């Protein structure tokens, strides 16, 4: 069957009975990842302005070839690789059907990457990208784009699996989407550092059961060390929601929460504690979203939020805070405005509609929010 995406027409598998369109047996196509692909195209457009020499693109798990086709339409010298010969054939047909140049290769991507160098490598596997991370980060020149769909291990819901795959201890906290993203980036940064490379996230997001990050590479032991310095641990109180990030690779967990005295404190790490995006680049990516994209509205909203988001290592769930405070919640925009009015930095966060970031501690937030409510009640009298 044929589908249209980003102004292009590609053939995808027929749907099985009861399955979503295009998700039939054999070659896989995921229609729910259109937002992911739209943002990827916008990133490729913006990155060409940032690094004009970046010209070659590897779609490392091509399947139908939709990512490679869209990259080729942007003028990238595209290679589509897959271990499934049917996928390679379908990707070639889709390139030809759109009058686009590109190479299709029946190869294991790890072997391919140790024989060829690409400016941009896109890893979009089913599940964890870790089996492909070494080859990609060691051999890409400029940019590695990574999707992870195994969100339960990443966020700590499947703790042992997360430890095995990512070499970190993720914890299932009230900010679990961000926990997963920072666990993923930590593993990728540590992998790149083994090859004396810095891997810095310039755009990242968590959407619909997957995490996605775009890592810009720079060679050199010193810059790799600088990235390692952005790793650390976070102590989290399960009762009052206190959390404390600490940079460094040696954990020093606390026994009790310094705010409420609870001994239910979880320590997570090593996590990436640095920014997950470059705000200027995120804004540039947003500007390169075009109306022919099926998820243009969502992409612009997402990227706008990412660009404005504070780079503090964790977000708070406003509903969870109000539950702890025993008060009815106010609107999110008013919540953020009250924090800013009290002198704290604050922003919404893209992870969910009730996600907020602030430089205020939880007691400071409570005073800023509920104190204002008390003042408002007094004025009304």
From Swiss-Prot:
Residues 1-369 form the Trm1 methyltransferase domain. S-adenosyl-L-methionine binds at residues 37, 67, 82, 108. One of its GO terms (biological process) is tRNA N2-guanine methylation. Its EC number is 2.1.1.216. Gene3D superfamilies: N2,N2-dimethylguanosine tRNA methyltransferase, C-terminal domain, Vaccinia Virus protein VP39. The keyword tRNA-binding applies. It comes from the Archaea. Belongs to the class I-like SAM-binding methyltransferase superfamily. Trm1 family. Residues 1-30 are annotated as: Disordered. Zn(2+) binds at residues 237, 240, 257, 260. It catalyses: guanosine(26) in tRNA + 2 S-adenosyl-L-methionine = N(2)-dimethylguanosine(26) in tRNA + 2 S-adenosyl-L-homocysteine + 2 H(+). It is an enzyme of class 2 (transferase). InterPro entries: SAM-dependent_MTases_sf, Trm1, TRM1_arc_bac, tRNA_met_Trm1_C. Disulfide bonds: none annotated. Pfam families: TRM. Dimethylates a single guanine residue at position 26 of a number of tRNAs using S-adenosyl-L-methionine as donor of the methyl groups. GO terms for molecular function: tRNA (guanine(26)-N2)-dimethyltransferase activity; tRNA binding. Keywords: Metal-binding, Methyltransferase, RNA-binding, S-adenosyl-L-methionine, Transferase, tRNA processing, tRNA-binding, Zinc. This is tRNA (guanine(26)-N(2))-dimethyltransferase.
